[in-house]
C-alpha cells in the first residue's frame, strides 16, 4: 500500500495502450458478439424433436409477426447463435391452441352450419346463430351492437341436463359431447332426418317416391351386390319388405282406391281384390224345366235327410243388392243337421221364403217341409263349393259357404225355445240346449219366476242373480 502526504491531490493513472490496436476488446462488459460470414452457410442444428427450426416459430409469437433479435449474448452463456433465430426455440415446440378449435384437428376452426340455408357461423357467434334460426334463416351480417350487448348479458350458459354452468359456449358443447355422450358433429355419411309429412303431402308424393323408377334404381336390380334397406312408412314408421308393398300400404293412410269395379261402385286398393270381386258378378245360368222336374221327383222319392242341397251353389247376386241380397242368398241353402232351413225362391226370383219358429223347433215339420222346398242336386249330400260374394273367400262345399255368409249378413236362423238365444249353426244350438237340461236322463232345475229349465243348480243360481236379483236377495 502506497502512502501519500496529506493535502496532496490524487494522481490519475492512464491505462496503458494496447499492443495491437486491431485486436482491442471491450473489457468493461465482457460481451462476445459473433457475426456469421456473408458467404458462409449457417450451420444447421440437428432436429431435437418433431419440429424443425423452420416449422416452429419463436416463443410468444406466431407467423407473420416481426422478429426481434435478442441482441448480444452474454459470454457466460457459452452458446453459439445459429443464424438470426433464437436457439432456445428449438426446445420449445409450441402449437397454436385457439379456444374454438376442434379437439382432433388444428387446421380448421369450428363452424355452426344451418341445415336449411347451409350458412356457416363461427362458434364464437353462437348467439347470432340462434337469432338466425329464430328469425327464419336471415343472412348473418356480423355481430351488431344489439348482438354484442346480448353476448355481454349472457354471462353463463347452463346445461339443461345436469344444470352445470359455463362461461364459454365451446366448453358447454364439449361438456355435452364428453359427459353426456351427445353427438355435436355431423360426418359426411350422416344426413339430417326428413321431417314427417302430412297425409296430403304423402298422397301427392307417393307416386314419385316409390314409383317404378325407384324399383329400377334399387341396388338389387342393378346387380351391385349392396344390401338394400327395407322401406319404411313415413306416417306410421312400419317397415315393409319392398317398395311395391309400401306403395300399397300408403293407400291405407291416404284413402286412395285406384281399382274400381265397372259394374258397381266397389273400389279397392289392390288389383287382386278387384279380380276377386269381379267373380261375384257372374250370373246364374237359368235352369231348364226338365232338370227342375227331375230334381223334384228325386227329392220326393228320397227319404228326408238333414244334408245340404244348394239350389245354385256357385250362384251369387249383384253387389247392388246389399245386405238384403246376401241374406237372400243364405236363406236358400241348408246346413247339415239343421232342423229345417230351406226356402226356395218364388217365380220372380226376388222374394225368398221365411222360416218360422215352428219349423225351426219342430223336427217333424222341418223334415216334411225340406223335401218339398229344397230340390236335390243329383242325389249328393253336399254340393260343390263357391266363393263368398262379400269377401271373395273360397270354400270347398256349400255348407261352409252358407255358414260363412251368415257372418256377413248377421242371420241367426237357429233360436232356443226356452230363451232368446239365437245362433247361425245348429251345433251351437244343440250345445246351448244342454244348458237347459234337454239331454235324455238329465235332471232339470226350473226357475220359479220365468219357468226356464236348467241342467245344473249353479246355472240356475247364476240366472237368478242376473235376471231376478230381487228374488235372489230375498232367498
Swiss-Prot record:
Key word Transcription present: yes
Feature: compositional bias, Gly residues: 339-351
InterPro entries the UniProt entry points to: Dev/Hematopoietic_TF (IPR051497), Znf_C2H2_sf (IPR036236), Znf_C2H2_type (IPR013087)
SUPFAM superfamilies: beta-beta-alpha zinc fingers
Transmembrane segments: none
Spans annotated as Disordered: 1-78, 275-385
Chief location bin: nucleus
Manganese recorded as keyword: no
Location within or outside the cell: Nucleus
Annotated Gene Ontology cellular component terms: nucleus
Comp. bias intervals (Polar residues): 354-367
MF-aspect GO terms: DNA-binding transcription factor activity; RNA polymerase II cis-regulatory region sequence-specific DNA binding; sequence-specific double-stranded DNA binding; zinc ion binding
PROSITE patterns, A to Z: ZINC_FINGER_C2H2_1 (PS00028), ZINC_FINGER_C2H2_2 (PS50157)
Biased composition annotated in UniProt, kind: Low complexity: 295-313, 326-338
GO biological process: negative regulation of dendrite development; negative regulation of transcription by RNA polymerase II; regulation of transcription by RNA polymerase II; spermatogenesis
Residue ranges covered by zinc fingers (C2H2-type): 157-180, 231-253, 259-281, 386-408, 414-436, 445-468
Cross-link (Glycyl lysine isopeptide (Lys-Gly) (interchain with G-Cter in SUMO2)): 35
UniProt keyword terms in alphabetical order: Isopeptide bond, Metal-binding, Nucleus, Repeat, Transcription, Transcription regulation, Ubl conjugation, Zinc, Zinc-finger
Family stated for the protein in its record: Belongs to the krueppel C2H2-type zinc-finger protein family.
Role noted for this protein: May be a transcriptional corepressor with KLF4.
Description of how the protein assembles with itself and partners: Interacts with KLF4.
UniProt name for this protein: Zinc finger protein 296
Organism ancestry: Eukaryota, Metazoa, Chordata, Craniata, Vertebrata
Amino acid at each position: 500500500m502506497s502512502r501519500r502526504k496529506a493535502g496532496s491531490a490524487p494522481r490519475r493513472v492512464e491505462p496503458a495502450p494496447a499492443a495491437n490496436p486491431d485486436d482491442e476488446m471491450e473489457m468493461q462488459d465482457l460481451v462476445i458478439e459473433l457475426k456469421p460470414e456473408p458467404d458462409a452457410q449457417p450451420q444447421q442444428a440437428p432436429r431435437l424433436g418433431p419440429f424443425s427450426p423452420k416449422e416452429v416459430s419463436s416463443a410468444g409469437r406466431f407467423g407473420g409477426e416481426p422478429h426481434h433479435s435478442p441482441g448480444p449474448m452474454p459470454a457466460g452463456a457459452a452458446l453459439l447463435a445459429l443464424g438470426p433465430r433464437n436457439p432456445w426455440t428449438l426446445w420449445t415446440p409450441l402449437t397454436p391452441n385457439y379456444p374454438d378449435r376442434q379437439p382432433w384437428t388444428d387446421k380448421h376452426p369450428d363452424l355452426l352450419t344451418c341445415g336449411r340455408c347451409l350458412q356457416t357461423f363461427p362458434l364464437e357467434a353462437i348467439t347470432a346463430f340462434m337469432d338466425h334460426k329464430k328469425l327464419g334463416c336471415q343472412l348473418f351480417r356480423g355481430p351488431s351492437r344489439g348482438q354484442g350487448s346480448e353476448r355481454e348479458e349472457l354471462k353463463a350458459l347452463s346445461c339443461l341436463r345436469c344444470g352445470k354452468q359455463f362461461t364459454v359456449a365451446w366448453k358447454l358443447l364439449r361438456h355435452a359431447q364428453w359427459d353426456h355422450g351427445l353427438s355435436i358433429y355431423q360426418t359426411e355419411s350422416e344426413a339430417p332426418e326428413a321431417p314427417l309429412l302430412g297425409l296430403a303431402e304423402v298422397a301427392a308424393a307417393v307416386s314419385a317416391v316409390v314409383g317404378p323408377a325407384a324399383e329400377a334404381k334399387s341396388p338389387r336390380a342393378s346387380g351391385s351386390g349392396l344390401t338394400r334397406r327395407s322401406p319404411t312408412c313415413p306416417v306410421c314408421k312400419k317397415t315393409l319388405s319392398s317398395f311395391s308393398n309400401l306403395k300399397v300400404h300408403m293407400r291405407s293412410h291416404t284413402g286412395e282406391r285406384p281399382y274400381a269395379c265397372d259394374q258397381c261402385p266397389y273400389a279397392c286398393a289392390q288389383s287382386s281384390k278387384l279380380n276377386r270381386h269381379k267373380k261375384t258378378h257372374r250370373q246364374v245360368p237359368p235352369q231348364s224345366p226338365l232338370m227342375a222336374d227331375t230334381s223334384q221327383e228325386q227329392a220326393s222319392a228320397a227319404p228326408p235327410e238333414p244334408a245340404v242341397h244348394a239350389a245354385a251353389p256357385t250362384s251369387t247376386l249383384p253387389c247392388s243388392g246389399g245386405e238384403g241380397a246376401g241374406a237372400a242368398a243364405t236363406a236358400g241353402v241348408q246346413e247339415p243337421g239343421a232342423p229345417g232351413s230351406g226356402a226356395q225362391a218364388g217365380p220372380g226370383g226376388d222374394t225368398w221364403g221365411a222360416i218360422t219358429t215352428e219349423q225351426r223347433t219342430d223336427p217333424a215339420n222341418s223334415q216334411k217341409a225340406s223335401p218339398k222346398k229344397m230340390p236335390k242336386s243329383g242325389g249328393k249330400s253336399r254340393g260343390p263349393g263357391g266363393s263368398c260374394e262379400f269377401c271373395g273367400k273360397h270354400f270347398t262345399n256349400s255348407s261352409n259357404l252358407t255358414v260363412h255368409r251368415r257372418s256377413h249378413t248377421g242371420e241367426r236362423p237357429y233360436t232356443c225355445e226356452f230363451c232368446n238365444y239365437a245362433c247361425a249353426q245348429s251345433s251351437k244350438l244343440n250345445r246351448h240346449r244342454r244348458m237347459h237340461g234337454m239331454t235324455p236322463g238329465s235332471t232339470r232345475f226350473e226357475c220359479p219366476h220365468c219357468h226356464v229349465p236348467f241342467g245344473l243348480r249353479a246355472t240356475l243360481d247364476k240366472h237368478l242373480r242376473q235376471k231376478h236379483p230381487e228374488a235372489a236377495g230375498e232367498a
